[in-house]
Design a protein with these regions (language model features):
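Exposed, polar/acidic Ser/Thr-rich sequence context and nearby capping/turn residues
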Residues: 1-173
Length: 173
């Protein structure tokens, strides 16, 4: 954003110690400051799990994803998680962890669909640093039934443009 103060009538300053108005007598030129736009990249982490999981195991890490913000610190208000497995009715007790700390509420992750985790202000990425989001759930269907031995499960995450905001710029990704 950009703003200018052109006349002394545009602002009023008060000295808090003396409780007196400060008179503006002369103008001074200033240089403009600019804030770069904000961008986000999400990649599967190199250490994201790919191994077998025991049937009915609890608190299984299904995937790890690296989030990187550039240009500005970035607030992410919602993350959408999804699972894919044939014949599976979703994952039971899904949850997201940001750098090892749970964010959002525990909820089932829909199969072939999307489940939105609302984060509010829990996820603010610092530009230029990597934040890791892990997806966990029980190795059961969303209905709590056992999975079939040998079944393959894929998980993913995504962020909608409308669910982001640059902390300083106010821009969306």
């Amino acid at each position: 954003f950009d703003f200018q103060i052109r006349r002394d009538a545009d602002v009023r300053f008060i000295d808090v110690d003396l409780n007196a108005a400060i008179d503006i007598t002369t103008g001074t030129a200033a240089t403009a400051n600019s804030i770069d736009g904000v961008a986000l990249s999400i990649t599967r982490a190199a250490n994201s799990p790919t191994s077998n999981v025991a049937v009915d195991a609890t608190n299984v890490k299904w995937g790890s994803f690296e989030f990187r913000a550039t240009g500005d610190d970035l607030k992410i208000e919602q993350i959408t998680a999804s699972s894919t497995a044939s014949g599976l009715a979703g994952l039971d007790n899904g949850k997201l962890f940001l750098n090892g700390v749970q964010v959002g509420s525990t909820q089932d992750i829909a199969n072939g669909g999307t489940t939105v985790f609302t984060l509010g202000s829990q996820m603010i990425l610092t530009r230029g640093t990597v934040a890791v989001v892990d997806v966990y759930s029980d190795a059961k269907t969303a209905a709590g039934a056992s999975m079939t031995n040998g079944q393959t499960v894929l998980v993913g995450v995504s962020v909608a443009v409308a669910d982001t905001e640059g902390v300083k710029s106010g821009d969306r990704i």
